[in-house]
Design a protein with these regions (language model features):
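Histidine- and acidic-residue-rich, metal-dependent catalytic cores
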Residues: 1-173
């Protein structure tokens, strides 16, 4: 999509049909199991029924679809768009952890976080304020908000307390 302006309601309704068109394309492929085909159809569904194209709730959304939905949201947040800048992976993970309840599978979000965050004690990161820091401690409940030591000053900073600063990128793992 190359339209820099907001979609009209009619255009958005057309966009919301892409899972149906995609499902029809893969429906007769014998190499794909039923769950994989449903993931194509349901990857924009949300647990609270607010998704599309069917508006079904959690109990009717296939587990594969819930996994793909989490990956799709993460990809959308970390990709550059005409209408907004991409977010850092850490910022995206933090947002997903905060806003997942009722929308996304908490298990799928946790799996993404655990496999993607890749932070280790001793890693060097660039913070949103431009400072470089070393990861000192990673809390299990907020892995995207560790305690870091500012390299220039030696000051310890808890990103779970200092909420206006976040990890922009990994510099050295």
């Amino acid at each position: 999509m190359t339209n820099p302006s907001a979609l009209t309601e009619a255009e958005f309704n057309e966009v919301k049909q892409h899972p149906v068109f995609s499902y029809r394309m893969v429906q007769k492929i014998p190499a794909l199991n039923h769950g994989a085909k449903l993931a194509v159809l349901q990857h924009h569904e949300r647990n609270d029924g607010s998704g599309y194209p069917l508006g079904v709730k959690a109990e009717r959304i296939h587990p594969y679809s819930q996994i793909v939905a989490v990956a799709d949201v993460y990809h959308a947040m970390t990709s550059e768009r005409l209408y907004r800048r991409k977010q850092s992976p850490f910022r995206a993970i933090e947002t997903m952890q905060r806003e997942q309840f009722g929308k996304l599978s908490t298990e799928a979000v946790a799996a993404l976080v655990n496999n993607l965050i890749g932070l280790q004690t001793g890693a060097v990161v660039k913070l949103s304020n431009g400072e470089m820091a070393e990861v000192m401690f990673i809390p299990s409940d907020e892995p995207a908000r560790p305690i870091v030591k500012i390299i220039e000053t030696g000051q310890l900073l808890s990103l779970s307390v200092q909420r206006d600063i976040y990890i922009e990128e990994m510099v050295q793992g």
